[in-house]
Amino acid sequence: MVFPFIMPYEALAINILIFGLFAMGFNLLFGYMGLLSFGHAAFLGIGSYLTGIGIVHYSLPWGTAILVGVIGAAIGGLIMGFLAIRTRGIYFSMVTLALGQIVFYGFYKAESLTGGENGLRGVRVDSFNILGIPVDFLNPLVKYYIILFFVVIAIWLISRILNSPLGAVMEAIRENEKRAAACGFDVTRTKLLVFVLSAAICGLAGSLRALHLSIVPIDSLHYLQSGQAVMMSILGGMGTFFGPFVGAAVMLYLEDVVTTFTRHWMAVIGLVFMFFVLFFPKGIWGTILSKLNMNQDTK
């Protein structure tokens, strides 16, 4: 739909789709449950690596490889969540960080499968058929729309989750965990379920990234990726539906522009982030929603 307007920046547009989805998956746990995880890079990396391994080492069809990546990330989320949700506050964050680093080290050492520090190369998807119609994945237009399709489906699923009874329970737990438990809600089970759903969505983002890059860099699992998800969510507006996506778009666009002028782009991004935290604590999208609501109230 919008592809003609973003040429020749299709790589940036695809990255925004992928990391926007990653941030939205993270925000499901952080923004809607109030649980700050520093280990979500593990799920981005698990999705990327399992999809890549499936294609490179086992010649799986790309659709099956994506499914393997998502399921693998969900299983990883189940294990990490089971261990982490028994803690609270900063302890929860530190446990997820430690577990994420264990996952990083595990994939780093499995060189025969993952390529170690060089990453996994050769994750190529050249062409395939959909309903008998040949599709060239190397065509940027085709790649953009295929990734957009998966992202739209995932966003729809997130919307369904938030508008379901589970979404109401999530909000109740975020606002007052003890009161939610007193009302009869299974807080621990809900936390674990949301953790798994969040991990699966982040795993899908990782799978799509592997197909987009045709390689899986080891930094997919690095804790800095988790930090990016935190920054994108806060920058756009944590606890808002599209906020993390907006944050991802702004952050990646700034990175793309600033890197052409200076190698110290991270410092510039940091200053922008501090500015919004200090003066727009609700984030970009959150501030826009607040202004719109105020305008409606005055009418």
Regions found by a protein language model. Name each.
Residues Y58-Q101, V246-G247:
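Alpha-helical transmembrane segments within multi-pass membrane transporters and channels
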Residues F19, S48-Y49, V70-A74, L97-I102, ...:
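Residue-level recognition of pore/gate-forming positions within transmembrane alpha-helices
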Residues L12-A13, L17, A42, G63-I71, ...:
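Hydrophobic alpha-helical transmembrane segments
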Residues M7-Y58, F82-T96, A172, E177-A182, ...:
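Single transmembrane alpha-helix segments in multi-pass membrane proteins
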Residues L138-P217:
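Helix-loop-helix "hairpin" substructures at the membrane interface of multi-pass membrane proteins
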Residues G119, E175-K178, A182-T190, V258-K299:
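Cytosolic-side transmembrane-helix boundaries in multi-pass membrane proteins
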Residues L67, K191-F279:
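Transmembrane alpha-helical segments in multi-pass inner-membrane proteins
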